[in-house]
């Protein structure tokens, strides 16, 4: 981290707060090195008090934000919502709630994020319990949630950045054939509605965490591999729109990857 913190073109580290010990360790590192680190919170890990709480220390979004503020003297922690969207809280899937109810819950969760000082919101519409999602439906849901969150931020005179997903974690890199069309439509909508265009795109790599290891081709990637070629095309597409690429679930990948 020391070596890279002053580099302009480098990979940023995002950490999921899987436990209070993990959160405290991140706070210790950011304080010692005086570097920014992003904490990315799934709705299962940390959830708004309006809907209950998360499994991490039973924290609500509101409580977690206050805890970080009380410990982060140099304001190095960047709070980010990870996988915000319909049915992204496991209780919603378990109870098989309707689309209207999960859509309302998603909005409540995002409002608490905004009120709690989150800087990045991940808009993830990739789950639907009752229908197979077309790319156009996912685009539509991304656009609507970006507009909703943007409007809520404007009411509060705040700003957030958006991350977007079109495929679930672990989806094949072959899905990127739709990517340029999708990003173009989302950017057009944002520009037409005075919404800041997304800053991050969670790219499909086929990579996912299984138990205590990574599955997928990312763990054996090299310059001659097919996945390297596919990911290079994906990254070039993102560069065309000046949107940063983000890879999820890299916990156990080797340094070479």
Regions picked out by a protein language model, each given a short descriptive name:
Residues 1-4, 41-42, 124-125, 157-162, ...:
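Short amphipathic alpha-helical segments, especially helix-boundary/capping motifs
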Residues 14, 107, 111-114, 119, ...:
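Active-site capping/gating regions of soluble enzymes
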Residues 34-36, 74, 157-161, 198:
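Short secondary-structure junction motifs
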Residues 38-39, 121-123, 245-246:
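Short hydrophobic alpha-helical runs that function as membrane-insertion/retention elements
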Residues 98-104, 127-139:
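Membrane-interface helix-loop-helix junctions at boundaries between adjacent transmembrane segments
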């Amino acid at each position: 981290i020391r070596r890279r913190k002053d580099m302009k073109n480098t990979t940023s580290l995002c950490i999921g707060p899987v436990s209070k010990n993990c959160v405290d360790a991140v706070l210790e590192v950011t304080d010692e090195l005086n570097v920014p680190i992003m904490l990315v919170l799934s709705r299962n890990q940390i959830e708004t008090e309006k809907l209950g709480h998360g499994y991490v220390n039973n924290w609500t979004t509101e409580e977690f934000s206050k805890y970080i503020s009380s410990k982060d003297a140099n304001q190095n922690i960047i709070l980010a919502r990870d996988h915000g969207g319909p049915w992204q809280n496991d209780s919603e899937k378990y109870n098989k709630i309707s689309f209207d109810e999960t859509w309302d819950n998603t909005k409540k969760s995002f409002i608490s994020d905004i009120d709690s000082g989150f800087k990045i919101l991940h808009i993830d519409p990739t789950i639907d319990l009752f229908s197979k999602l077309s790319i156009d439906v996912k685009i539509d849901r991304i656009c609507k949630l970006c507009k909703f969150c943007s409007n809520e931020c404007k009411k509060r005179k705040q700003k957030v950045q958006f991350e977007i997903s079109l495929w679930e974690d672990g989806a094949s890199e072959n899905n990127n054939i739709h990517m340029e069309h999708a990003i173009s439509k989302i950017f057009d909508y944002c520009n037409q509605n005075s919404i800041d265009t997304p800053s991050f795109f969670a790219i499909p790599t086929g990579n996912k965490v299984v138990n205590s290891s990574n599955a997928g081709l990312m763990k054996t990637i090299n310059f001659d591999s097919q996945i390297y070629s596919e990911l290079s095309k994906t990254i070039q597409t993102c560069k065309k729109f000046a949107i940063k690429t983000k890879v999820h679930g890299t916990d156990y990948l080797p340094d070479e990857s």
